[in-house]
Amino acid sequence: MSNRVIIFDTTLRDGEQALAASLSVKEKLQIAMALERLGVDVMEVGFPVSSPGDFESVQTIARTIKNSRVCALSRALEKDIDAAAQALSVAEQFRIHTFISTSTIHVESKLKRSFDQVLEMAVGAVKYARRFTDDVEFSCEDAGRTPIDNLCRMVEAAILAGARTINIPDTVGYTVPSEFGNIIQTLFNRVPNIDQAVISVHCHDDLGLSVANSITAVQHGARQIECTINGIGERAGNCSLEEIAMILATRKGMLGLETGINAKEIHRTSNLVSQLCNMPVQANKAIVGANAFTHSSGIHQDGMLKAQNTYEIMTPESIGLNRNNLNMTSRSGRHVIKHRMEEMGYSEHDYNMDALYEEFLKLADKKGQVFDYDLEALAFMEAQAEEDNHYQLQQLVVQSDSTEGVATATVRIEVGGEIKTEAATGNGPVDAAYNAIARATDRRIDIISYKLGAKGVGQNALGQVDITAVYHEQNFHGVGLATDVVEASARALVHVMNLTCRADKVADYKQSMQKNRELGGV
């Protein structure tokens, strides 16, 4: 049996289900390209039949990604498989992933069928998917609670029908490692054709055991692990990719297994997903948390000064985190900035050097020193600015009366190429800025979530504001970064307004298409 573990990333499918607002096609593509740099073997990027937006994003990613296999999900229904095959047809290499529930509670309560009927549906779905590709994965949903006799029957039948990967999900995160390992071992002992497929696992974290269950599974013969960046996903989340990758790398001598993951891309990819998904990483998160390589105890610090491996089983550099952040000033030349971006893993194709350097100089004049995390934040802001924005914030001036609590904000904003200036008051500077922007744009949205964070540490940190807003019964997520919290809030609002503007254009286009169809049918 091979010692190579296939890494199947489902951040853009299972992970996205946890988000308050869906990612845009451009944001999904950014993450997909980061996953490709990271070296994932397979990336599951959506559920094409679920919506036109999901279909478009799967197709766009399938057209772009070259080095990873692109996968789409489908139920055990022909219409789902057709949609997945159509969206994936432009890919260099693709996989169709079809699934059906197999546990007694799901079969009887959700599907309202007999197990034999469900088995027949599964076989039919796999055979149908094989018409489009040889690479078909079949999942036994809620396998962790499926009677073992039924699970063995289902796995054998799916392999016989043509599935080349069989996924065993612990859908509700119910099993413990010894129990889950026994399930995998039993399949290897009792399914006669199991050597004709790769056994995969997909563990959820409801009891905090997703990573432990996945490691136990590969010790018993599984050779694919399904996971997400930062462990994001429904409810308590999924198995964390970065934890799996670093466990297998750090304990290779004991486990004897390896992956194709480029570990130096882990930190960068984690940051990107956290930023775009508006899901901060907890400080004590293994591998990528802010405190993962922090040593506060005097005894620990003394040991670290004598020998790093006294208290570090891996280095921050191994995941692409530079231990010694080089501070830069307004006197730093373009070559310094380019060099630092390269050291952090960014190629010149990932950002606009002219725009980045211009923003760097502005920030350096304000802060004095600029750090690595600042550059990453500026590159993210610059990428946002390159989008086709109807609204662009030019200037924000705020005056606040600390005794009365009333603030006045004046904004200059470009609206479709026209400069508008408006002023408004509010209950505090952020409220005043929001009111002024709403007046200038003549667009009202309802903010349902406002989160204030920091990019960096100490007094030199950049303010990061994440907002979720409702517009026409849809949720939109905006991010703003600036040295000033009020400006960051204003930028986040403008970001959301641009997203709603694009949504209006899409709605108008769909309405126009519908009218054309109706006229054509008369």
Swiss-Prot record:
Upper classification of the organism: Bacteria, Pseudomonadati, Pseudomonadota, Gammaproteobacteria, Alteromonadales
Similarity field: Belongs to the alpha-IPM synthase/homocitrate synthase family. LeuA type 1 subfamily.
GO cellular component: cytosol
EC number: 2.3.3.13
Protein's name according to its UniProt entry: 2-isopropylmalate synthase
Organism: Shewanella baltica (strain OS185)
A Pfam family per the record: HMGL-like
GO MF: 2-isopropylmalate synthase activity; acetyl-CoA C-acetyltransferase activity; manganese ion binding
Function according to Swiss-Prot or TrEMBL: Catalyzes the condensation of the acetyl group of acetyl-CoA with 3-methyl-2-oxobutanoate (2-ketoisovalerate) to form 3-carboxy-3-hydroxy-4-methylpentanoate (2-isopropylmalate).
Keyword Cell membrane recorded: no
Region Regulatory domain: start-end pairs: 392-522
Pyruvate carboxyltransferase domain residues: 5-267
Catalysed reactions, semicolon-separated: 3-methyl-2-oxobutanoate + acetyl-CoA + H2O = (2S)-2-isopropylmalate + CoA + H(+)
Subunit structure, as described in the record: Homodimer.
Gene designation per UniProt: leuA
Gene3D superfamilies: 1.10.238.260, 3.30.160.270, Aldolase class I
Residues reported to bind Mn(2+): 14, 202, 204, 238
